[in-house]
Amino acid sequence: VFDKSEDAIAYIKAQNTFPTVIKAEGLALGKGVIIAENLEDAIAGVHEIMDDKVFGDAGNRVVIEEFLTGPEVSVLAFTDGKTIKPMVSAQDHKRAYDHDKGPNTGGMGTFSPSRVYTANDDLARICDRLIFEPTIDAMRREGRPFKGVLYFGLMITKNGPKVIEYNS
């Protein structure tokens, strides 16, 4: 997480791994992500978010993340702060153009349940055991128990499910 564009750019240069993901840390209506294919695009992306404020105050800080490939799956879950009960999965289509191309939008369409999530009987159990329950447990241990509906944005990679974002 970076507060200054020059620090974010220095980190990107040191990593020298592309594509790389640059996210506005704040809420940007599902649009605060830039996937940079090269250093030039990454530098421009950091400046757009942090200096030009294309996402407003959401871009006061940026998160630089590893680029993951695979289908995205959304899971909403009810929690009382101790137990968690996932609802049915969904799959969004966020990109503006066909074939997952173009800038992210607030959402071009969604279907439920996600075929990716339901096609593998073990995936829901893996997410429960390795993502959902540990998230609730960690929040409680940190003195921030959460009660309500929690959103898990997941990427199903060749190495298993990875969390790309949480929302409440």
Per-region residue spans from a language model:
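A conserved helix-loop-beta module that forms one wall/lid of the active-site cleft
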Residues: 1-32
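Internal nucleotide-binding/catalytic subdomain
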Residues: 32-168
